[in-house]
Amino acid sequence: MRKLYYMGLEPYKARYTLQLQDWNETVFKQRKLDYVIVPGETLSNDQAIVTGQVLDAHGRTYFGMSQLMNLIKMMKAGELNSEDVIYFEDMFQPGIESLPYILKQIDPSHRPRIYVRCLAQSIDPDDFVHVWGMQDFMGHYEKMVDSFVDGVLATNEEMVMHMKIAGWKAPIYNISGLAFGKSEVQSRVANIKPFADRKYRVVFSARWDQEKQPDFYMDLIEAWHAQPGLEEVEFCVCSGSSLKSNNESYMKRTRELFLAGKLKIYENLEKNDYYNIVNDSRVVFNCALQDWVSNTVSEADSLGCNVLYPAYRSFPETFSNDPDRLYIPWSIEDAMDKLEALLDFPHPRMGEISDRNDSTIDRICDILEGKGEDMLRMTTDYRKHTRESKF
């Protein structure tokens, strides 16, 4: 690889995209890569996710298309050649259809290799594209991207399988993790608080949307309060904006639990605010139907907080099949038993999950440099890797 052209995501103060470029650049510099950050233009400076859930729909589209315009200027000027790589942080990149249109009509010596990272989309039955009825066009879009890229990066073995049954043909790699910068996250708190000094607090960090299954978390809260003799615990939900949901029934129940003093709401949090809450909590709890690896597990694990997630889809791989921090989906009894234990003592393997994800960008760079054969999943027996512990 002569030069890497990095197509990142618009930074939002309350989202992981704020740190994503910095995490990548730190690794690029450590590896002494020659790279270009392809800039995009923001539609608004208000940092608000007004339309949509993950990123603002108008803002994401505008930023992505402006990036493509800048990339195409570079291509027109002859700055890219066949030894270069364009890497997209998100397979969904508005304007990306312009690339095969151009590349098919120019000299092969100026055709860079192209890799995209898949975050979910229509291959995930619980992704928000299905909530909003976008699956038809998104499926066609994915097939279009699949037809011309040199590689698709999956975050785990289960996602690889979903890509396979969707009929994708491009080379698929399992990077087994999400891009993450452990030291950067830890630098955002004054110090890692000793576990024994932390509040008996359980944090829910996912969006309050149906694919994250907040009803199960609220079931757990009510079951905990109904069982005598258990530790008094603060159950909370953290949100980077005003708490909202794509299902109003959750908000009604949330208000009821809040008024009953059973659920605390922390909203409009910036990253440092959220990290300070996690740094003074004992468990981050997850019950998502749709969550591939999740940055929340790495953040909590970096900040000395226990993590409890369902043994579902990507999480057995993410947790290296740890039975103490994975509960039976969707067993309230098993979740409560394991939560009770994790509230009392730090897990002996705390820190290993975040260490693993801290090296994800290195694994991505290996693939981009043509050294990722061990992560390629194109043989008929590709499922053999599912049982393998990654750390």
Protein language model regions, located:
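Glycosyltransferase donor-sugar binding loop
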Residues: 232-251, 267
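N-terminal pre-catalytic "stem/leader" segment of glycosyltransferase-like enzymes
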Residues: 1-98
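Membrane-proximal helix-turn-helix segments that form the acceptor-binding/catalytic region
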Residues: 131-152
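Nucleotide-activated donor-binding/catalytic signature segment of Leloir-type glycosyltransferases, i.e.
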Residues: 248-272
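Aromatic "clamp/platform" in nucleotide-sugar-dependent glycosyltransferases that forms part
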Residues: 288-290
